[in-house]
Amino acid sequence: MRFIGLVLLLLSVKLFGIDATLEIVKNTNKIPYIVVERLDSENADFGAKVLKMLAADLKVSGHFQVYDGSVNKNSEVAYKDYADKKIDLLAQIKVSKSSNSLTGTISLYDINTSKRIYVKDYTENDVKRFPFIAHRMCIDVNSYIQAPSIEWMQRLVVLSQYTTSGNSEILIADYTLTYQKVVVKGGLNIFPKWVDSKQESIYYTKYLDVPTILKHNLTTGHIEQLVGSEGIAVVSDVSKNGENLILSLSPTALSDLYLYNTKSKNLRRLTNYSGIDVDGKFVNNEKEIIFVSDRLGYPNIFMMRLDGGGTEQVVLHGRNNSAVTSNGKYAVYTSRETNNEFGANTFNLYLISLAPGSNYIRRLTASGKNQMPKYSNDGGTIMYLKYYKAQSALGIIRIDYNTNYFFPLIKMKIQAFDW
């Protein structure tokens, strides 16, 4: 069994003609120290926001030790002063505003070589999208040191939130939820799912005559009806090429899983159980699915092959495992740890290997109610909802670095999300 543990960053980077900063990282088994400064400019408000977001992104990456250098009025870089403080990299930013557009400029300096590495501009045509300027800056700084990719930072999160009784709206947001934009409203709109990696269209369920799965192009506004079902109609997963969907439908009784081909419109039933089968996810090169079922009398995690055959119980731990996500080779599930009839219960997240014969299991959370785990598109990060002591937050787990980060949910009641 392959162990997922803490990664020794950058030690396996293969370079020819490696520069001084990367040489230090390689030889001393440490991650680089970076100072982030804002150059004095007229747009202090947005400059401060981008600076704060960039520093946070660098920390979340797990690839830097970050110092916030605040405002610098001196355009000359005092390399020796930074070197004396054991600083490896310096990032200086400034932000300019034109009408409703923002442009952020970053100058990255390698203190060990006393050289400016690059100057890059990043423009967003909506000032509310300033977080993405910071996210893109961070991705490029991360690429410079050739650390593992953090491209997931610039992906959009799509989420549904309850507004009033019987109503919910769908929003798109950055991973910190700092940027938010409503894209669907009016009625009950739930279970949003990205159509593909381009993030131009979404699937979601809308209550019409019956719950109905819709495909909504966010650019053109075009809406297409796919499938309706009396009790439940949800897109649980999308194949990598976007052609096949796993649907949770209940046309006659309780929920079963179906495979839907978006080109042929063919709908094939995968499970035929008298109870509840939901939350199916593609695994093992999309030859199998993992899903939640109550066929043992309580919710648990099972697997089955798409070409037929019986179901296999995957999780032997716990008696209430109610949600699952997978990157194909590993899965993360939600498990109820307590059974308080009248009080709050604890739900934790667990990571398991899907390799045949593996018994690897690792707890990812320790307290509170941790639910709705979702893997990032690169399979290295988990997003989830955390409720603890009357507070709620969107959580990020960097699996290889054993770190958690939280973004408070203020006046938000999230129904479901995808990223």
From Swiss-Prot:
Protein's UniProt name: Tol-Pal system protein TolB
Subunit structure: The Tol-Pal system is composed of five core proteins: the inner membrane proteins TolA, TolQ and TolR, the periplasmic protein TolB and the outer membrane protein Pal. They form a network linking the inner and outer membranes and the peptidoglycan layer.
Biological source species: Helicobacter hepaticus (strain ATCC 51449 / 3B1)
Keyword terms: Cell cycle, Cell division, Periplasm, Signal
Pfam annotation, one family: TolB_N
Superkingdom of source: Bacteria
Disulfide cross-links: none
General function of this protein: Part of the Tol-Pal system, which plays a role in outer membrane invagination during cell division and is important for maintaining outer membrane integrity.
InterPro entries xref list: 6-blade_b-propeller_TolB-like, Tol-Pal_TolB, TolB_N
Signal peptide extent: 1-17
GO biological process: cell division; protein import
Localization per record: Periplasm
